[in-house]
Amino acid sequence: EAFEGFRIAFISDLHYKSLLKEKGLNDLVRLLIAQKADVLLMGGDYQEGCEYVEPLFSALARVKTPMGTYGVMGNNDYERCHDDIVNTMKHYGMRPLEHEVDTLRKDGQQIIIAGVRNPFDLGRNGVSPTLALSPKDFVILLVHTPDYIEDVSVANTDLALAGHTHGGQVRVFGVAPALNSHYGNRFI
């Protein structure tokens, strides 16, 4: 009941300066602000070069939400700029979640947000951070690729949010599908 009407904004795969340019970023920030979300969740693949990390997160920091901003890294973010992204997110008061959980509390109730570290490295990250959680809690799993949800047990997860597929489920500023999940069109 405490979270009745709770609004989540979710963005992923911005690929800033490749798919998303400066005008598009400013439009996105305005759109996010207008949504008046309670929390902003981000699914990774933020940039196309380390020099774009600071301006990207500086712009996203203009989106103020009562319960904060959380993000996981995408495959591009592990390939380059990982530490820059983590440090810049923290600098702007955002919380990177790499196989970690955090709890949103309101009037004695809670929502748990669990974030997955590099979902492509199942040897190191093949145990979901949700397994240790209580099935009584409402848990949001934040992961870069939806394939992780099929490849690994994500017990105790009530809602999973992922990006990566660029599958056109939601087109932002006319960007068309580019990469599909190996599970096809199963994910929306």
Locations of the language-model features?
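Binuclear metal-dependent phosphoesterase catalytic core
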Residues: 1-4, 90, 104-107, 133, ...
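Membrane-embedded segments
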Residues: 3-97
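Short, flexible loop segments at the rims of nucleotide/cofactor-binding pockets, characterized by
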Residues: 15-21, 45-49, 116-121, 137-139, ...
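N-terminal post-signal-peptidase region of extra-cytosolic proteins
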Residues: 27, 54, 98-99, 123-128, ...
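Binuclear metal-dependent hydrolase catalytic cores centered on His/Asp/Glu-rich metal-binding motifs
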Residues: 87-94, 98, 106-143, 149-151, ...
